[in-house]
A protein has these predicted regions:
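Bacterial N-terminal signal peptides
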Residues: 1-6
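Short S/T/G/P-rich N-terminal loop/turn motif that feeds into the first structured element of a domain
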Residues: 7-205, 210-232
Length: 232
């Protein structure tokens, strides 16, 4: 899956979110969003791919500081076996080959990809299609995780606190990046309200005090889910 390219907490009939174990995330630039979206949708609805019922999403990436990243494609896998199976299926799929050709014709350029796993999840973000992601370098995971979990649980007390908080570990890709945190919202306005207010909360002040020097911020970006498949 070298040429295909954070998101996926979407409403369904489950009582609780059914989070994936592994997430394969592909970041790229696309100057023609409709064409890239059409290429991805065509592949996901091709018979050989559709029958696999992969959970996946195409998202727009905003305000992340790099002009060569505009979108991401994310696949969510419940097990290592499912991930391995998908790699084999995509490598031999005619629809995947066509997808690569159509993305290239649309001017898409891959930037980087990584593999992540969820470590901590607070709240229920199904149906919340807007997110803010904080990418970090964590040097002391135990200290950082405990501080984050406390903050996330209490941040829901705020009117701008969002719907869900996810902490991911990054297994591959991204240089010194080790983890990322995403907060999900029902609208872009809610995400902006959060960004404007969270630094002034007692919850964040406590997090900074407890986390201390256990982490270094790397970058922050906003995202919006555009296309979603088989949400779980």
């Amino acid at each position: 899956m070298a040429i295909i390219f954070s998101f996926g907490l979407i409403a369904d009939d489950h009582t609780e979110p059914n989070y994936s174990k592994f997430q394969a995330n592909y970041f790229f630039s696309c100057p023609n969003e409709p064409a890239c979206g059409a290429a991805f949708d065509k592949m996901m609805n091709s018979p050989d791919i559709k029958e696999q019922k992969y959970e996946a999403a195409l998202s727009r990436i905003n305000l992340q500081g790099y002009t060569n990243i505009t979108h991401s494609i994310n696949f969510y896998y419940k097990s290592a076996e499912r991930f391995q199976e998908a790699s084999e299926i995509f490598s031999s799929s005619p629809a995947f080959a066509v997808f690569g050709q159509e993305m290239a014709a649309a001017g898409a350029q891959p930037y980087y990809h990584n593999l992540t796993s969820y470590l901590i999840a607070e709240g229920d973000g199904r149906g919340a299609n807007y997110g803010v992601t904080f990418v970090t370098e964590v040097s002391n995971p135990v200290v950082y995780f405990n501080a984050f979990k406390k903050m996330a649980a209490k941040m829901f007390e705020e009117s701008f606190g969002g719907e869900a908080y996810l902490l991911r570990q990054q297994h591959t890709g991204g240089g010194n990046v080790t983890h990322s945190v995403s907060v999900y919202f029902n609208s872009n306005a809610e995400a902006l309200d959060f960004l404007a207010n969270y630094p002034n909360t007692s919850q964040f002040a406590q997090f900074v005090e407890e986390a201390g020097t256990s982490f270094k911020p790397v970058r922050t970006y906003m995202e919006q889910a555009l296309l979603q498949y088989n949400p779980d």
